C-alpha cells in the first residue's frame, strides 16, 4: 500500500492535429504535455483527463499504446512513466428536471469502455469532439448508462454559481435531478472546502474530491487528493472512494475558499463585494451580482455539527499565488526539489532559502501552513494574498 496524489479534473485544449477540444483551454494543453507535466514536474500519480470521449483523443491514446509510449493497466487506466491516466468525460446535463445546467464527471475503466461510451454519446451530443457538451439525455438515464458500464459518476464543482448542481441546477436537493444511489462522489470546487460542505446533510453519503479543473498546464495540481491505495489505477481509485479494503482518501488539498473566484457574492463587472440590501454595485453602479458559494451554502445548510468523519482538508496555496514566485523562480524550485509536490510538502525552509530569497522561502512555508492573510474573491475574480 502507498500514498499517492490524484488530480482528477484536467482538460485537453488541443488534440495532436491541433483541433480544439476545450475551447477555453490553452493550446499547450495537449495530451503529451499534460502527462509530462503531471509525471515529471507536478508529482501527480493519478490524473483524470476528462475529455477522453473526444475521438481524436481516443485515437492518440490508441496510437500511444501501439507504439509503447503508453501502457494499459489491468486495474484500469493508462500508464505513462510515473503517472496513470484515468479516462474521463465532462458532460453538461440540462433536462426537464433541472433548474439550470449541471456539469458532471464520468470515468470509465478502460479505453475500450471509453470508446464504447463515446459512440453512445455521439448520438446525444451536437459535437462529440468538444469538451463539456450538453448531453441530450436525462441525468437519470446517464447515471444508469454509467453504472451499467462499470463507470463512476461524480457531479463537478457542485457549488460553483454557473453550471453546477447547487449553483443553478437544483432548487435545494440533488434528488430533483439524480438518483442519489448512483453518485460515487462529489467534487467541491475551488470556492468551497470540507467544513463548508459538511453542513449540507444530503451530502453525508458521498466522499468529497478536490480537483484543479485545469485549463492550462500551470493549473494542474492547484487542488488534489491524497489517496492510500495498492496502486494507481481505476479499480484502486473506486475502492478508495468506497473506503473498502483499507483503501481511502487520506486528505483533500485545496485552495483556501477565500481565494476562489466565487467565494463571496460580488459584482460581475468589477468584483466589488455586494452590500446586503443593495441592488446595484456601490463601486461601478452595475446591477449584476453573482451569488457567492458562501451565501449559497448558508441557504442549503441544515446541520450545525459535522456528523460524518471526513479526511482532513489542507488549505493549499499554489506556488503561483505566492508573492515572489514567478515562472523563473518556479523553474528553479522544481530543478532543486524535483516536483511542485516536493516543494509544497517536503522541502524545509532552510533548504528553500538556498534556492530562493529567505523572504520567499518563508512565504512558501506560511502558504503550506495556512498562515497567510487573504483577501476574498468573488464575481469571477480570484482572491489574493494580502501584502
Swiss-Prot record:
Family, as annotated: To M.jannaschii MJ0043 N-terminal region.
Matching NCBIfam families: TIGR00375 family protein
InterPro entries cross-referenced by the UniProt entry: CHP00375, Pol/histidinol_Pase-like, RuvA_2-like
Full protein name: Uncharacterized protein YqxK
Coiled coil: none
Gene3D superfamilies the record matches: 5' to 3' exonuclease, C-terminal subdomain, Metal-dependent hydrolases
Domain of life assignment: Bacteria
Alphabetized PANTHER family for the sequence: PHOSPHOHYDROLASE, PHP FAMILY, PHOSPHOTRANSFERASE
Provenance organism: Bacillus subtilis (strain 168)
Amino acid at each position: 500500500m502507498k500514498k499517492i496524489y490524484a488530480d482528477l479534473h484536467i482538460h485537453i485544449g488541443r488534440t495532436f492535429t491541433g483541433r480544439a477540444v476545450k475551447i477555453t483551454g490553452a493550446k499547450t494543453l495537449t495530451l503529451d504535455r499534460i502527462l509530462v507535466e503531471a509525471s515529471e514536474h507536478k508529482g501527480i500519480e493519478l490524473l483524470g483527463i476528462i475529455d477522453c470521449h473526444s475521438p481524436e483523443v481516443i485515437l492518440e491514446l490508441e496510437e500511444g499504446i501501439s507504439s509503447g509510449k503508453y501502457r494499459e493497466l489491468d486495474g484500469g487506466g493508462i500508464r505513462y512513466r510515473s503517472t496513470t491516466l484515468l479516462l474521463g468525460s465532462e458532460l453538461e446535463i440540462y433536462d426537464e428536471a433541472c433548474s439550470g445546467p449541471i456539469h458532471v464527471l464520468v470515468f470509465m475503466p478502460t479505453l475500450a469502455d471509453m470508446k464504447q461510451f463515446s459512440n453512445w454519446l455521439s448520438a446525444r451530443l451536437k459535437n462529440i469532439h468538444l469538451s463539456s457538451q450538453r448531453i441530450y439525455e436525462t441525468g437519470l438515464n446517464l447515471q444508469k448508462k454509467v453504472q451499467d458500464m462499470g463507470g463512476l459518476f461524480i457531479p463537478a464543482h457542485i457549488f460553483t454559481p454557473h453550471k453546477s448542481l447547487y449553483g443553478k441546477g437544483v432548487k435545494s436537493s440533488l434528488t430533483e435531478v439524480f438518483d442519489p444511489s448512483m453518485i460515487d462522489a462529489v467534487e467541491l470546487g475551488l470556492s468551497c472546502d470540507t467544513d463548508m460542505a459538511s453542513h449540507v446533510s444530503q451530502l453525508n453519503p458521498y466522499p468529497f474530491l478536490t480537483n484543479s479543473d485545469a485549463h492550462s498546464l500551470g493549473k494542474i495540481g492547484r487542488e488534489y487528493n491524497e489517496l492510500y491505495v495498492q496502486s494507481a489505477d481505476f479499480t484502486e481509485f473506486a475502492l478508495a472512494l468506497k473506503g473498502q479494503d483499507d483503501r481511502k482518501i487520506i486528505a483533500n488539498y485545496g485552495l483556501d475558499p477565500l481565494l476562489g473566484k466565487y467565494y463571496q457574492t460580488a459584482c460581475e463587472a468589477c468584483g466589488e463585494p455586494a452590500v446586503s440590501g443593495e441592488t446595484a454595485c456601490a463601486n461601478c453602479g452595475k446591477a449584476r451580482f453573482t451569488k457567492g458559494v458562501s451565501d449559497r451554502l448558508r441557504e442549503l445548510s441544515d446541520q450545525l455539527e459535522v456528523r460524518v468523519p471526513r479526511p482532513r482538508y489542507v488549505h493549499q496555496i499554489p506556488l503561483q499565488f505566492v508573492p515572489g514566485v514567478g515562472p523563473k523562480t518556479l523553474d528553479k524550485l522544481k530543478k532543486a526539489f524535483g516536483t511542485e509536490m516536493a516543494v509544497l510538502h517536503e522541502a524545509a525552509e532552510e533548504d528553500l532559502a538556498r534556492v530562493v530569497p529567505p523572504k520567499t522561502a518563508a512565504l512558501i512555508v506560511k502558504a503550506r501552513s495556512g498562515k497567510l492573510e487573504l483577501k476574498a474573491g468573488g464575481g469571477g475574480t480570484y482572491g489574493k494574498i494580502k501584502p
